[in-house]
Structure formats: C-alpha cells, structure tokens
Amino acid sequence: MYDLTALRQQTDEIIDNLLKDGSDPEALHIIEHHIAHHDFDKLEKLVVDAYKLGYEISEAEEIEDDQGNVLFVCDIVSEVKLNGDIITAQQQELLPLIEKAAAEYEGWGTYFEDPNAEEDEYGDDGEFFDDEDEADFNNAKVH
C-alpha cells in the first residue's frame, strides 16, 4: 500500500522545483510514471490495463538491481499540465493496477519545458510517441 499523502508531498516538491527553475507552467509536460517488475508477463498485463485507460507506454527494458536480480522497467506516460491534482489523480488510478500486479511504483518524472523554446523538441506534431510506436504496441501479441 502506497502512502498517497507522501506521494502528494513529493509531487508538490517536484513541481515547485521545476517552476522555480523556470519550466513553463502553461506547457503540457510529459509525465512518466516509473514501474518495475521481476516478471515480464505481469508487467505486460499491467501496462495493457494502463493503455486501456488512455496512457502511452514506453518500451520495457531489462535491468539488474543492486543485488543482481533481473527487473523489467517501463514508464506509463501521459502529457498533461504540470498540476499536482492531475498527477495525484493519475497515481490514484494507476496504483491499484500496480499493486494488483505486485509491481513496484518508483515515482514519476518529467522534463523541463523551456518557455522560450521556439520549437517543440518532439517534432512538428508535438507528439511524444509517433504513430509507428502506437501501431507497434497495438499489434503486439498480448499474453
């Protein structure tokens, strides 16, 4: 069980620091909720459920933890205003899925959005994921 009060405090601190550093408060930010699991199939089921809720999913990677155990990690991604209420609502929606899958929620992150940038770093359409990535996910075999 995750402590939503502590998560909200962390969220508020992250947002405050980004805004103090000058990140654009009006920009949409890519929010990446970091997930880890020792079982790829269970992680895959979790991210399919998150995808059905409207989130994008980054490609899973295999890593080793400090003890040499294999973990599979990925991000559940959205693009929203940098707003604590929105991010907390996402956590409240995702944490039951994460707990059900016995996965680990490792917090969330985002990128600095320069208010003076002339061009979107994600290209002309401003999309974090391109249509090919989405098509690849939709065509992936689900176990």
Swiss-Prot record:
UniProt entry tagged with the keyword Cytoplasm: yes
Compositional bias (Acidic residues): 115-136
Pfam families per the UniProt record, alphabetical: RraB
Recorded GO MF terms: endoribonuclease inhibitor activity; enzyme binding
A cellular component term, taken from the record's GO annotations: cytoplasm
Renumbered residue ranges of the record's region Disordered: 113-143
Family per similarity comment: Belongs to the RraB family.
Protein name according to UniProt: Regulator of ribonuclease activity B
Organism field: Haemophilus ducreyi (strain 35000HP / ATCC 700724)
